[in-house]
Amino acid sequence: MIMRPTPDMAMLLAAGLFALGLLGVLVRRNLLFMLMSIEIMLNAAALAFVAAGTRWHAAEGQVMFLMILSLAAAEAAIGLAILLRMHQAGRPTLDADTGNRLKG
């Protein structure tokens, strides 16, 4: 017997991915890993919206997925620009606690 994926299974997967991303943001101090964890959290939220839209036969879940996808792209671009600026400023570390020293 083959089990077919259901929206409930997708919601459980989204909750697990979100928890994993949240754990990564709270535990890691490296900005690159924090950005990757935020991306995991955004993808989990997008999966939850698609699963909810599938469950209730609504197209809003897919619309929200596209909105989250564009938000994730903007977040990645801004985050990587900040990381590049920190590297150009001569900071050898990507520790989140040194980010308050950015100027200009």
UniProtKB/Swiss-Prot annotation:
Its placement in the membrane is given as: Multi-pass membrane protein
E.C. numbers: 7.1.1.-
The reaction(s) catalysed by this protein are:
a quinone + NADH + 5 H(+)(in) = a quinol + NAD(+) + 4 H(+)(out)
Matches recorded under PANTHER family: NADH-UBIQUINONE OXIDOREDUCTASE CHAIN 4L, NADH-UBIQUINONE OXIDOREDUCTASE SUBUNIT ND4L
How does this polypeptide assemble, per the annotation?
NDH-1 is composed of 14 different subunits. Subunits NuoA, H, J, K, L, M, N constitute the membrane sector of the complex.
Q: What does this protein do?
A: NDH-1 shuttles electrons from NADH, via FMN and iron-sulfur (Fe-S) centers, to quinones in the respiratory chain. The immediate electron acceptor for the enzyme in this species is believed to be ubiquinone. Couples the redox reaction to proton translocation (for every two electrons transferred, four hydrogen ions are translocated across the cytoplasmic membrane), and thus conserves the redox energy in a proton gradient.
Protein name in UniProt: NADH-quinone oxidoreductase subunit K
Q: Please give the organism.
A: Gluconacetobacter diazotrophicus (strain ATCC 49037 / DSM 5601 / CCUG 37298 / CIP 103539 / LMG 7603 / PAl5)
